[in-house]
Regions:
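Glycine-rich flexible loops
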Residues: 1-206
Length: 206
């Protein structure tokens, strides 16, 4: 359990570095946030920050529902984070990354299949958000709608959005989403279009 805001931000930074090292995002792409549990305060990466160079000073402090003025310039995707926190009171962390295989499969019209128990347990289902301009109200609103039913969503021709009760779970889901996409791609290369994790088996392990 995280006892302080500083511990939450430190966890966010660690998992952001891992996300870059894993190839889930490059350069200044992506944005992440963490909410202080039980409050309307959250911290989101500032505009233009690189996720592998984050420090505690790389975050803007926000309040859910705030539209400005801001003490620091938040990521251009702050509306997406804000809308999801408003929609999901159980969510304390949001990762918006750019997993290339997941985005590619979606763009080509292929459904991402689950092959492992972790995929089925932690990802469970994947929402799809049609393309909308970066930072737009339309993107934020549709992402929040998808997150009413899913913990992971593909943002068409853009990236993914994953949520969790803490940064570790939000990152885990993003990583597993891309793993499932890569395995789907490999299966397709081998000519397989049907194999997937047995339906309902994950309930035994929940």
């Amino acid at each position: 359990l995280y006892k302080t805001t500083e511990e939450l931000v430190d966890s966010l930074i660690r998992h952001a570095h891992t996300a870059v090292a894993s190839g889930l995002v490059l350069g200044s792409g992506g944005n992440i946030s963490v909410r202080t549990p039980g409050s309307d305060e959250y911290f989101i990466t500032k505009s233009g920050t690189w996720l592998d160079e984050l420090t505690p000073a790389s975050f803007a402090r926000m309040k859910i529902g705030q539209t400005g003025p801001f003490d620091s310039r938040p990521s251009s995707e702050w509306k997406l984070h804000d809308r999801i926190y408003r929609t999901r009171s159980d969510v304390n962390s949001i990762f918006h990354l750019h997993p290339q295989t997941a985005v590619l499969l979606n763009a080509l019209g292929y459904e991402i299949r689950f092959f492992t128990l972790d995929d089925a347990l932690y990802v469970k289902s994947v929402g799809v958000v049609p393309y909308h301009p970066n930072g737009s109200d339309e993107l934020a609103d549709e992402a929040a709608r998808q997150m009413e039913k899913h913990n992971c969503a593909i943002l068409a021709h853009h990236g993914c959005c994953t949520v969790g009760e803490d940064p570790e779970m939000a990152f885990r889901r993003a990583s597993l989403l891309e793993q499932a996409a890569q395995n789907t791609y490999r299966a397709m290369l081998l000519g397989d279009k049907e194999t997937a994790f047995p339906e309902g088996v994950e309930l035994i392990h929940a």
